[in-house]
A protein has these predicted regions:
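Rhodanese-like catalytic fold shared by cysteine-dependent sulfurtransferases
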Residues: 1-33, 40-75, 84-123
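Short, surface-exposed ligand- or partner-binding patches at beta-edge/loop junctions that are enriched
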Residues: 78-79
Length: 123
């Protein structure tokens, strides 16, 4: 059977932990690391403060060498624009041995709607 993108996203969502924007803010306030898996231009336009950027397409190749992601037990909040790429990325991180990863429901779009913590931009 041929898979659709939504089938793949739904399969990922079945095996990961998703958190609301409010839960993500609480995790980040308590030391979790934000991982932005959007494309670089999206990240540069605006991102969660202190988020580390690794695009979805390069995740498997770059995460192991990134200094902030050496501890596979560290708490990580993964986000994208609306939640699909972050779900796929979170499932991938779990397969790579990361034990405490969360996908943020609604992504950066939803984070930005209630921006009591304003996004950062790249200069």
């Amino acid at each position: 059977m041929t898979q659709t993108t939504m089938n793949l996203v739904n399969a990922a969502k079945a095996v990961i932990t998703e958190v609301t924007v409010q839960q993500a803010k609480e995790l980040l306030a308590n030391g979790s690391i934000a991982m932005d898996v959007r494309e670089l231009l999206e990240y540069e336009t605006g991102h969660i403060p202190n988020a580390r950027h690794i695009s979805r397409g390069m995740l498997e190749f770059m995460v192991g060498g990134h200094p902030d992601f050496q501890d596979k037990s560290a708490s990580i909040v993964v986000y994208c624009k609306s939640g699909g790429r972050s779900a796929l990325s979170t499932a991938t991180l779990q397969q790579l041995g990361y034990q405490n990863v969360h996908s943020m429901l609604g992504g950066f779009d939803l984070w930005s709607e209630g921006a009591d913590i304003p996004p950062e931009t790249q200069a």
